[in-house]
């Protein structure tokens, strides 16, 4: 099965996102998105980008793109920011709620980035975020380190290719483990009898109509 994944470089255009010194979040987001996308494409994934240039889109437009192309997954790339310089470090992955394959994928991405040296801040539910709430497929938002953390920026810059590969590998690994949920069946009791012959007589009715019957005591 060829999966279709929408990759979103957060912010863009007139919305720079978080800014630290000469660094703009929108630029980091776009660069990482394109590298991750190339790795996924090389592994047979149909990748759709919300943007490949420095343009502005509302979160609603980003979600609309994912819905219109019928994506199987939506992944948005961001950098975090703290009130004070070097106050916090680490990565976190945001999802609508902690359930399903999106939760598994988020945990895999978080763990993969942790192995590179980023502090793991955990997978968190953020149902209020538009790109997580308005998308009709499993959606994740990755906060790849704090843009105003010197240690995070150093790790981000020195291991940019490794960071992209870690994210892409975690995504691909989750997809390879994806299973189809088994359908749910309900048991229907047609009667309870003291005499065996009455039970046998009743049992013939659904059998004649093609339904399997399993007698129990």
Where do the protein language model's features map onto the residues?
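Generic anion/oxyanion-binding catalytic loop in active/binding sites
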Residues: 18, 55, 188
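Active-site beta-loop-alpha junctions enriched in small/polar residues
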Residues: 12, 80, 193
């Amino acid at each position: 099965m060829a999966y279709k994944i929408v990759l979103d470089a957060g912010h863009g255009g007139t919305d720079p996102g978080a800014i630290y010194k000469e660094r703009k979040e929108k630029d980091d987001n776009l660069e990482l998105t394109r590298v991750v996308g190339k790795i996924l494409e090389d592994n047979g994934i149909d990748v759709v980008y919300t943007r490949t240039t420095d343009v502005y889109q509302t979160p609603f437009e980003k979600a609309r793109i994912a819905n219109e192309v019928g994506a199987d997954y939506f992944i948005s790339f961001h950098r975090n920011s703290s009130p004070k310089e070097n106050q916090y470090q680490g990565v976190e992955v945001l999802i609508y709620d902690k359930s399903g394959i999106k939760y598994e994928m988020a945990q895999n991405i978080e763990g993969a980035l942790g192995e590179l040296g980023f502090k793991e801040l955990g997978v968190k539910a953020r149902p209020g975020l538009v790109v997580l709430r308005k998308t009709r497929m499993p959606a994740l938002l990755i906060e790849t380190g704090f843009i105003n953390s010197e240690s995070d920026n150093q790790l981000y810059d020195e291991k940019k290719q490794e960071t992209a590969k870690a994210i892409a590998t975690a995504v691909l690994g989750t997809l390879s483990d994806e299973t189809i949920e088994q359908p749910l069946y309900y048991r229907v009791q047609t009667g309870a009898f003291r005499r065996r012959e009455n039970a046998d007589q009743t049992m013939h009715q659904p059998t004649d109509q093609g339904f399997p019957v399993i007698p129990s005591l």
